[in-house]
Amino acid sequence: MVDVEEKSQEVEYVDPTVNRVPNYEVSEKAFLLTQSKVSIEQRKEAAEFVLAKIKEEEMAPYYKYLCEEYLVNNGQSDLEHDEKSDSLNEWIKFDQELYNELCKKNESKIKELNEKIQKLEEDDEGELEQAQAWINLGEYYAQIGDKDNAEKTLGKSLSKAISTGAKIDVMLTIARLGFFYNDQLYVKEKLEAVNSMIEKGGDWERRNRYKTYYGIHCLAVRNFKEAAKLLVDSLATFTSIELTSYESIATYASVTGLFTLERTDLKSKVIDSPELLSLISTTAALQSISSLTISLYASDYASYFPYLLETYANVLIPCKYLNRHADFFVREMRRKVYAQLLESYKTLSLKSMASAFGVSVAFLDNDLGKFIPNKQLNCVIDRVNGIVETNRPDNKNAQYHLLVKQGDGLLTKLQKYGAAVRLTGSDRV
């Protein structure tokens, strides 16, 4: 009876359109400005885009943060010193007049939204109306890049009697603030709260959105195995256009899938994925990672390193989530392809192996030496004879020991079960 009364008191919440706040494209383009390996042309376009969006979306707090903190602390000074880069600072230079103009617009809009909240509370309007008013104000703070006020204001709507689904929407908006500023500790905390809410009553659509959010978080913190599972699954159910684009999700799924999936799954879930195939012709980043994936799967070693370098430049470096993992990814993909080639041989000459990859013997010798000492590759180099000898573990011996171990475990369980049965029988007597 109590449950029925509680449910009747909860205000029915009509799901609103999920607004794209903050604008993830602004954050992604701003990241490009800090990368000296990105072309001058790309950074110029990024600067123009960011400034246009700052003006359009009245982002005074973000504009100040961008110019006085982000670009100063994240490497804009590392730009190449050529005749073009001398003017680069001018593209994103702090303009006090523009900032003051944006601040006035912010103050006017915030005042208007606060007055609506005050009127609703004075008129003792329903919980739903008050909650939506707080959400509107919080989303405006999110839009302009005011993280602290956005979180605090959106949090006030959670205290209203709104549905679990509505609360999940609010928490996902708060989580997007963390993605926008690439604060993954913040994101982790908020997504844990979202997951708790979903377990209490999240619908199918919100569960799928959470899957995408958590998948990108896993990508950002280098949990590629979990990211691959979530992002590959998200391809068929993606709706989180407020967080990222479908093209980006496809690229992330391809990167993590290539890194973690075995050959059979790689073929079915990535190479032959209809969702990915439909985007390749129009998505440059996806073309690079797809070419790398196919070269590995088809053992096309001659084209593997060129595609790996292309992926590094076109996919990893420009991505704010993958950039910090770029060198790690390239290193591990070299190890993976070496292991795949050596799997087919007991011995192989360094010259033949170097020729297969289109590199020098000296480079290959040095590169293999990075993986062999710590057993990341099961082989040794015989420099006297110029060959690589594999020393893979004896699979049959390993299988035998595993069988014995599993048999012992089964025998122990059967003995315990037998003792329990005998005890039950004696009790009955």
Curated annotation (Swiss-Prot):
Signal peptide: none annotated. This is 26S proteasome regulatory subunit RPN7. One of its GO terms (molecular function) is structural molecule activity. It comes from Saccharomyces cerevisiae (strain ATCC 204508 / S288c) (Baker's yeast). SUPFAM superfamilies: TPR-like (SSF48452), Winged helix' DNA-binding domain (SSF46785). The gene is RPN7. Transmembrane segments: none annotated. It comes from the Eukaryota. Component of the 19S cap proteasome complex which acts as a regulatory subunit of the 26S proteasome, involved in the ATP-dependent degradation of ubiquitinated proteins. Its main location: nucleus. Present with 51900 molecules/cell in log phase SD medium. The keyword Translocase does not apply. It is found in: Nucleus. Residues 223-395 form the PCI domain. InterPro entries: PCI_dom, Rpn7/CSN1, Rpn7_N, RPN7_PSMD6_C, TPR-like_helical_dom_sf, TPR_rpt, WH_DNA-bd_sf. The keyword Membrane does not apply. PANTHER family: 26S PROTEASOME NON-ATPASE REGULATORY SUBUNIT 6, 26S PROTESOME SUBUNIT 6. The 26S proteasome is composed of a core protease, known as the 20S proteasome, capped at one or both ends by the 19S regulatory complex (RC). The RC is composed of at least 18 different subunits in two subcomplexes, the base and the lid, which form the portions proximal and distal to the 20S proteolytic core, respectively. Component of the lid subcomplex of the 19S RC. One of its GO terms (biological process) is ubiquitin-dependent protein catabolic process. One of its GO terms (cellular component) is proteasome regulatory particle, lid subcomplex. PROSITE patterns: PCI, TPR, TPR_REGION. TPR repeats lie at residues 131-164. The modification Phosphoserine is found at residues 8, 77. Keywords: Nucleus, Phosphoprotein, Proteasome, TPR repeat.
